[in-house]
Amino acid sequence: MTVRNLDALFQPKSVAIIGASLRPDSVGAKVWRRVREAGFNGPVWPVNPKYAELDGCAVFADAADLLEAPSVALICTPSETWVDVVGKLGRLGTRAAVIVSDTDDSSSPLVSHVLAAAKPHLLRIVGPGSLGVVTPAVNAHFGAPSAMVKTGGVAWVSQSNALTNAVLGWAAARGLGFSHAIALGGEADVDAGDVLDYLASDPATRAILLELSVVRAARKFMSAARAAARNKPVLVLRTGRSDPSDALYGAAFRRSGMVRVDSLDDLIDEIETLGVGRIAASSSATLVTSDRGVAALAADAFAAANTTLAHWPDAALAAVASALPRAAGGNPLVLGNDAKPEHFGLALEALAPHRETGTAFVVHASTLGAPVAEVARVLIERQRFAYRGMLACFFGGVDDETRDALRAHGIALHSTPHRLARAFARLVDYRLGRELLMQTPQGLPAQVPVAIEAAQASAKAALTAGQTMLEGADAASLLSGFGLVVSSDADSAAPAEGLHDDEHIVDVTVTLRDDADFGPVFEFTAPPADEASAPFSVYGLPPLNPVLASEIVSRSPYAQRAPVAPVLDALTALSEAVCCVEQIVGLTAVLRVTRTRARLVGPRLALGQQRGRLAIVPYPRQLEETLDWRGRRLTIRPIRPEDEPAHSDFIAGMTPNDLRMRFFGAVSGFDHSQLARMTQIDYDREM
């Protein structure tokens, strides 16, 4: 996990174009022309032995002839030159290079030699096969993107050159901008995880849009994605939804806190919402319009997007009735077909003091008494009253001047209520997902070290003896050490006769499968809600705690059919077993659930040797130690999420001077989200 030298890539001071050319249709000519047209803020040094000058600029014959190291080098030469060029750039002190080429094969021996030439100099490589990197704030359009884009607050990260070109072109045509945009190419060195890690703390980036088809380094990617999604919205589009592993990707995205979108249209809509509008601080909405038909259409769109219309308190109803006596109060708020532009402003003012009314959505079709341009002017004047954010939809569109004025004042604009509602729903999904992942879980039952050691010894002994599968009494013995109630008899997989109906028996299947991209993944398969439906499986990545296990179960038909608590206990115990016994690479068992307990029936454990196999590093039990201190026996261990209450008590007992020395400033207290950041750490990157 490293962001080393990525600042040179995204905040370049100078650039060298290796292979700059005037030859029509050559990569070097396209890149040279694009960099020149963009007007990069720093020096541009072309390198090509075939030219003495290009467009009035002196040309260097060789990369080694450069008088100083460029921040970034754009390599546009044939592949057989890459190793030599990278070596020379590295010796100069160049910190980043982008290989702009037609091929994105990162597995070839040639690319291995390129990385070997770069490694001694800590030179970062983007590509091969990258379209380029764009940072509009410094007019850096490095590569061959077809469109020039403005500066904005959203970053675009993609594995596809074609989609990058399309999105940049779409944004440029609509006057939208980016903080950064990068097409990763073959990801031989710099990959999606590295870029997410950098953008997570980039002050110019308010949100991240990610397009990918495959994750190449799951552990690094998950760590970076979780860190980024805690700081700002990360929305992801994965192409290839027909891929059998797509459901696993969905589980990984949810676990990291990213929000998945279904189409490129959805992703493009978020460029408007996140790049222009103030990110809504509410999960509910108030609709303001002048027409009942428009109100009904908008309300239907919000219902279809599973977005909640706010329930107004009596005080809000009274305030609106006082300010707008002729309006049809309630949500949606219908001002009437004779409404004037100022009535929209009065509505915003009346709603402003009442947090329960949520984010304001103005949906309007132009009328004689309220032309769109005049309503937009009022929204701009009164946008200071939209404390919880404001978005707008004007049927029929607006002229460029009005659109630009709305955006300049932080009011995002969408063409239809449907797109407006879906864009807001994704922000709500992000907020709710982040809140879920930051919940403080209940403490897990303490695992006895002796039991863990016995389970590990059992698995090691079986592998040494040539066994790759444990079942029956052997599997039951290993798992029972983690507090699971286990029946080793596979024949008992059918529900036992003679049990009372009030025990409400339900059987679910729990499988641990080894995914090629994400390693071990739990598959939870519940019986269908009716006989006409097929069994439905949901997935989750270990390690699991009760909160994360609950999220898995809530997405299955089981959540509405049987007691949940026994299943959560069983899933978290199975997760502990998988995390503590690294030899477990697969598992299949039936989980029989009654009202009071869940029993594991007929488990089968697949064994193997796969170190570092989990995509998310579990609690590092091996770092626990004990020591004697002033006559007491103390346990020193890594912090856990369930330590939040104790950590809060610890901070509350500190003196003001202790707080100032520990947190480098005056501190009055910490809320849940701040405490969660201290206790819910990433063990891979923070320990």
Language-model segments: what does each one mean?
Residues 650-658:
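Catalytic strand-loop segment that frames the active site of acyl-thioester-processing enzymes
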Residues 658-666:
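A short, aromatic/hydrophobic, helix- or strand-capping loop or linear motif
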